[in-house]
Amino acid sequence: MANPKVFFDLTIGGAPAGRVVMELFADTTPKTAENFRALCTGEKGVGKMGKPLHYKGSTFHRVIPGFMCQGGDFTAGNGTGGESIYGAKFNDENFVKKHTGPGILSMANAGPGTNGSQFFICTAKTEWLNGKHVVFGQVVEGMDVIKKAEAVGSSSGRCSKPVVIADCGQL
């Protein structure tokens, strides 16, 4: 079976920035890929925290040029929240795939076994993250849109304009 593809339609400062299409590695990380896929479609409804289990309307709260764009905190919006479709947090599935370069999609965490809904898209090779963060997909179209998002980031991670997932889903 082919790996699923999902999309984000991003806005930057309220203006449409374009579509990012990602392939999810369901073949190597089925549980992690399924979590992200379902959070793109919103099909699981409302989570334990009372918020929709959906990336739609959430922001990239941390964008560091030359490193990565991080998002997925749809409960708090600032990097302290998020929730998986499995409940609060889930374990690191495996570290088969590596942080080989721009476009790699990986889970953000707060240490081993703390995966929720936060993720990041690499804008560079980040091999020091291998064995610490689960790589579960890659950007297949729209890396130019990620570059636009990267351009409003800063070394602190704060964005000069909000980068919002205006719409998302499965293709």
From Swiss-Prot:
GO term, biological process aspect, one: protein folding
Cellular-component GO terms for this entry: cytoplasm
Catalytic reaction annotation: [protein]-peptidylproline (omega=180) = [protein]-peptidylproline (omega=0)
Residue intervals of the PPIase cyclophilin-type domain: 7-170
Enzymatic class: isomerase
Pfam families linked: Pro_isomerase
Notes on activation and inhibition: Binds cyclosporin A (CsA). CsA mediates some of its effects via an inhibitory action on PPIase.
EC number: 5.2.1.8
Organism superkingdom: Eukaryota
Subcellular location: Cytoplasm
Tissue-by-tissue expression: Expressed in leaves, floral buds, growing shoots and stamens at anthesis.
Keywords, in A-Z order: Cytoplasm, Isomerase, Rotamase
Family that this chain belongs to: Belongs to the cyclophilin-type PPIase family.
Function: PPIases accelerate the folding of proteins. It catalyzes the cis-trans isomerization of proline imidic peptide bonds in oligopeptides.
Protein name: Peptidyl-prolyl cis-trans isomerase
Organism: Solanum lycopersicum
Encoding gene (name): CYP
